[in-house]
Amino acid sequence: MTVDAVLIYAQRGHGRRSGVYSDYTFALWSEGDSAQTRELVPFAKAYSGLSDAEMREVDSIIRKTTVDTFGPVRSVTPTQVFELAFEGIALSKRHRSGVAVRFPRMLRWRRDKPVAEADTLASLRAFFLPR
């Protein structure tokens, strides 16, 4: 199971990654009718899947595109898309997105894909959740 999601938040990792922004929060588009009415909604955090070189490159982008900080978390301009894989999905009243994913991880950095073409929460629910 995979989706193309947008990087919206980052925080420093732990251990050998403590100096690098390597813990990421990803979002999918809401169900708005147009580009003006939809928004990015956080739905998953992922920490693994990138090479050390890719992580350093993403770290540099995060430092250049930070728009706000809250505690250890940096909010970044949504410019990067990643393909995320996960083992399962369930409905969740706890999460703003309405879904919880199991074992999310980054498969690849979608440098070829614009943010506007990232997946939507509606497509995630329709494809992966039973009716």
Which residues make up each language-model segment?
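Classical nucleotidyltransferase
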Residues: M1-R131
